[in-house]
């Protein structure tokens, strides 16, 4: 789950 959240944030940034 953590890696998925990081991916989402990275996409926004």
Swiss-Prot record:
Record keyword Iron-sulfur present: no
Coiled-coil portions: none
Summary of the tissues where the protein is detected: Expressed by the skin glands.
Residues with the Leucine amide modification: 13
UniProt KW Secreted keyword: yes
Chief place where the protein resides: secreted
Intracellular or extracellular location(s): Secreted
Keywords attached to this entry: Amidation, Amphibian defense peptide, Antibiotic, Antimicrobial, Secreted
Biological process (GO), any one: defense response to Gram-negative bacterium
GO annotation, cellular component aspect: extracellular region
Family in the record: Belongs to the frog skin active peptide (FSAP) family. Temporin subfamily.
Protein role: Antibacterial activity against the Gram-negative bacterium E.coli and the Gram-positive bacterium S.aureus.
Designated name of the protein: Temporin-1Ja
Species of the source: Rana japonica
Lineage of origin: Eukaryota, Metazoa, Chordata, Craniata, Vertebrata
